[in-house]
Amino acid sequence: MIPPEQPQQQLQPPSPAPPNHVVTTIENLPAEGSGGGGSLSASSRAGVRQRIRKVLNREMLISVALGQVLSLLICGIGLTSKYLSEDFHANTPVFQSFLNYILLFLVYTTTLAVRQGEENLLAILRRRWWKYMILGLIDLEANYLVVKAYQYTTLTSIQLLDCFVIPVVILLSWFFLLIRYKAVHFIGIVVCILGMGCMVGADVLVGRHQGAGENKLVGDLLVLGGATLYGISNVWEEYIIRTLSRVEFLGMIGLFGAFFSGIQLAIMEHKELLKVPWDWQIGLLYVGFSACMFGLYSFMPVVIKKTSATSVNLSLLTADLYSLFCGLFLFHYKFSGLYLLSFFTILIGLVLYSSTSTYIAQDPRVYKQFRNPSGPVVDLPTTAQVEPSVTYTSLGQETEEEPHVRVA
């Protein structure tokens, strides 16, 4: 008898042995201490390069560069003021501020005057005139106090105490703008301040720490007062340009700044202005000062909106170094290698600060006083719990998990 066929056994193809694949994979792994470590090292280097490219991205470099443009404008302001006060004995800080406010008035206030609707100058004045009046006074007196301090205290004290604006901006941004910082931001801030301390140390070593110093306590208090007012003005500026517009801020600053500086000029500085030996050189210096000041005021809101008030004030720490580098050729200052160390230390701190975005724990109930009536208004339910939103403020999306925000 013929045995029955077994089709199932014939139809099943031989399955490949799984252990062969596993064995092959294990055999291909580089052994410890062998030449395979080179590939691991190459992958590590590639990972480091990728992280560096992520940190030094285009947006971050643009932000740092914009801050340095502001520093160069402040350098121009300082140089023209130095020539006016030391070479031509024209000590007119209020008049110089008055010229800047007049330019802002002519450009931005007139722009508001010709607008229609809720963005018109009269409509803005009806709703917010007293707030801009206070802001104009703060901005004017911040400039005046710091310039006045040079008559009483030393350059070293002014450079150190002027850094007080940074903690003022951080605290005001935290409580009023609800900006939240990460550890890397505080590390960057500390590095920037260390760079500033290095510059002051270099000034002491080369003998630039001397100053008038007639009444050092009064001068130091003037610097602290001016730095505090600067911080308030910068945070208020960021608040307005993020909720309203840059043109409105500059137009109202020009209006009230010109008004109050004109009054202060007539009361306190008219005699000094009459003593100025007017000629084409002095006129050119006033034009240069006004151009740099107008450029600073016009460009700073753009940089603040792209970054933040804190980032801008950190960037401005290099302004003294630019003035010093120019002074090496113009005023024959002594050079120290610590100046270069200070410059690059501040830049490293800026890179660290800008490498990670800050974020805003934004409660929709916060921005009420400067709300733009022409913009869309969203009615929030009164019975439901208002939940905050988390918005990154500077340099793009973060890959890490968004921090948890709680509203009390």
Swiss-Prot record:
SUPFAM superfamilies the UniProt entry points to: Multidrug resistance efflux transporter EmrE
Residue ranges, annotated region (Disordered): 1-21
TM segment ranges: 60-80, 94-114, 129-147, 158-178, 186-206, 221-241, 247-267, 284-304, 311-331, 335-355
Keyword Transport carried by entry: yes
InterPro entries referenced in this protein's UniProt entry, alphabetically: SLC35_F1/F2/F6 (IPR009262), SLC35F_Transporter (IPR052221)
Bilayer topology annotation: Multi-pass membrane protein
Keywords: Cytoplasmic vesicle, Membrane, Synapse, Transmembrane, Transmembrane helix, Transport
Pfam families for the chain: SLC35F
Domain of life according to the entry: Eukaryota
Any single Gene Ontology cellular-component annotation: synaptic vesicle membrane
Cell location: Cytoplasmic vesicle, Secretory vesicle, Synaptic vesicle membrane
UniProt similarity note: Belongs to the SLC35F solute transporter family.
Protein function: Putative solute transporter.
PANTHER family hit by this protein: DUF914-RELATED, SOLUTE CARRIER FAMILY 35 MEMBER F1
Protein name, entry field: Solute carrier family 35 member F1
Gene: SLC35F1
